[in-house]
Amino acid sequence: MTNLTLALDAMGGDYGPRITVPAALQALRLYSFLNFYLVGNKTDIEKYLSQVESDVLRRIEIIHTTEVVTMSDRPAHALRNRKQSSMRLAIELVRDGKAQACLSAGNTGALMAMSKVLLKTLPGIDRPALVSCLPAVNKTPVYLLDLGANVSCCSETLFQFAVMGSVLCEAVDKNCSPKVALLNVGIEEIKGNDQVQQAGQLLQQSPQINYTGFIEGNDLFSGRVDVIVCDGFVGNITLKTSEGIARLLVHQLEKGLTKGFFVRLMAKMIAPRINSVLNQMNPDHYNGASLIGLRGIVVKSHGSADESAYLQAISLAVTEAQRRLPQMIEERLESILLDINN
């Protein structure tokens, strides 16, 4: 297995090194080919390394900085004034070819702004998109993009998102022909605004994309399609609503299983099955959103992620780096555009 190096913004997120460093250590024990740059305050990071075995420790290099991007920093401010921040230095390691992917749980807007400026977009891609997974009834995750990187999009941008989402699904899930749909207010061809309708027409002209038409919100988790495309305004609200509903259902189920002797007894008897269902519904199981369309790999973790959830995001970054996702997107987009022009 070829060695991989990830650059980790160790100070990002609600808990900083208290979560990011132990999760990185878990990943190093899980992947023998993995190395880390841990970017952040050396003193804070080393608190979590004192008891670490030597074979793991030698695969870590600390890049010291005391500057951080705060959650209240506006993207433009962070771009201009946080040039020595842990987030920026981590992205620069990818730009300079020292790391194959960057991971941060920090300020999403700042991460997107810095990534776009430092890494640049791929040829043929106007804007990067934020993409993550939703659970589905058939247990195969559904990719949803954009999740907030672009609050409004033209039809060409939505088309590019569809291409990138399709390639991501191929790369991560090894799905050779992912089904792609546009999120809309109805499935009829006459429904939706001009941007969505025109994006649908572009996708219909692309034989390399398995475009299935429009999909409504009530079909998000049906597993009928593999990739769902929308603008960032719709996508962000959809994702946050889905996560809220999932947490509500998990809470209500856990609460209900503690009421009454016979209910508790039955719950113990079927505990493995219950835990499996709860795990599938838990948003932490799907932690890790990819900022795709860039010349390098950037993965965003939830700021509130615990150690297990953060490890999920690291694993996603590892998979994308192994599959060389940016190169796959670039090659596929070039091929698709050539098909359309011919």
Curated annotation (Swiss-Prot):
Pfam families: FA_synthesis (PF02504). Its main location: cytoplasm. GO terms for molecular function: phosphate:acyl-[acyl carrier protein] acyltransferase activity. InterPro entries: FA_synthesis, Phospholipid_synth_PlsX-like. One of its GO terms (cellular component) is cytoplasm. It is found in: Cytoplasm. One of its GO terms (biological process) is phospholipid biosynthetic process. Its EC number is 2.3.1.274. It comes from the Bacteria. It catalyses: a fatty acyl-[ACP] + phosphate = an acyl phosphate + holo-[ACP]. Keywords: Cytoplasm, Lipid biosynthesis, Lipid metabolism, Phospholipid biosynthesis, Phospholipid metabolism, Transferase. Homodimer. Probably interacts with PlsY. This is Phosphate acyltransferase.
